[in-house]
């Protein structure tokens, strides 16, 4: 299964995203010197617009999980400035979009690599500053480029990080799989490392994906 990246949220900012092949798998988290990684793709967002060879801007509603925003292509919602990708949520009374009957009053940004960049196994990370606005739910996650084993959740989902604007000490990692939405399974972790500063500060969130195993990292 090859997966691509999906990034959505309100005032979520990323200065870099990268994918790497893992050369060595035997070192502890704090032994950064011996982590031998060979980047296969990265985006530093150094220009003034999103790289269309790597990214799509998703523009529509999102019907799941009570999301109440319309994702927009507008530059005020998705822009690249000063070495960062900015996904911005805005109060827009009366906003409506297809795919989400609950949408209204808010617009936001959502980008994905679907159909352009995908990987099977390796290490994926991004440096992200999250919002602190109430009811925001930004995320950095991976979903199959093609539904090899069937529709969600059969083909899986890897959530590298999801946060809540109402709780700046919350950062969840997750994975979903199963035969149906009524029989889906997931594994979720919320324990944050000692000394972790709130999610509105810059942090690097990553996942190391090997056959039969997912390891999640913060900083």
Where on the chain are the PLM-derived regions?
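GH16 jelly-roll
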Residues: 20-219
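Sec-dependent N-terminal signal peptides
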Residues: 1-5
């Amino acid at each position: 299964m090859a997966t691509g990246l999906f990034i959505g949220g309100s005032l979520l900012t990323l200065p870099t995203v990268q994918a790497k092949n893992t050369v060595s798998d035997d070192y502890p988290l704090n032994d950064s010197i011996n982590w031998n990684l060979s980047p296969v793709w990265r985006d530093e967002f150094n220009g003034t617009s999103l790289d269309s060879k790597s990214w799509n801007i998703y523009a529509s509603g999102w019907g799941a999980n009570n999301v109440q925003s319309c994702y927009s292509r507008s530059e005020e919602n998705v822009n690249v400035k000063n070495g960062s990708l900015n996904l911005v949520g805005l109060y827009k009374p009366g906003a409506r979009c297809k795919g989400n009957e609950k949408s209204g009053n808010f617009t936001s940004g959502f980008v994905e690599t679907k159909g352009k960049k995908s990987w099977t196994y390796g290490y994926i990370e991004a440096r992200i500053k999250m919002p602190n606005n109430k009811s925001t739910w930004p995320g950095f996650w991976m979903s199959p480029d093609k539904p090899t084993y069937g529709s969600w959740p059969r083909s899986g989902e890897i959530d590298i990080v999801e946060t809540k604007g109402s709780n700046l000490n919350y950062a969840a990692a997750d994975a979903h799989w199963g035969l149906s939405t009524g029989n889906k399974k997931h594994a979720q972790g919320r324990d944050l490392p000692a000394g972790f500063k709130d999610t509105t500060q810059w942090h690097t969130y990553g996942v190391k994906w090997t056959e039969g195993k997912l390891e999640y990292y913060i900083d």
